[in-house]
Amino acid sequence: MITTKVARRIIVVLDAALKDLVFEKVQSLGACCYHYMEVSGQGLHAVTGNPYSGEGLLRMEIVTTQETGAKLLDWIHAAQFAQLSHFALFAFADNVEVDERDQSITKVR
C-alpha cells in the first residue's frame, strides 16, 4: 500500500518577462519540484497567445511543502508587485497528495 502525504501545489501564471525573477525566488525558497509551459488566454487587460504580438504567458506549477507554498504566495502578493501591475502575474494553490517516499518535495536546496 502506498502511503501519501499532503503537499502544496502553487500554480503561477506570469508574463514571460517575469520568468527569471519568479524562477529565482522559487529556487531561493527551496522549492525544487516545478515545471512550466507556455499558455495563452484572456485576462482583465489583454488577450495573450497571439504568435505575432510578441506577448507570452507561462504557467508554472510548483509542488512543495505547505510552509514554502505559503511563503511563495506571500511573495507574489506582496506590495513589491504593485510596481509590476502592468504584467500578468497571479497565483492560486491547492493541496495534492504525493507518495511519502518522494523526498524531492521536502528537499531544500
Regions found by a protein language model. Give the residues of each.
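Positively charged, small/polar-rich N-terminal and surface patches that mediate targeting and assembly
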Residues: M1-R109
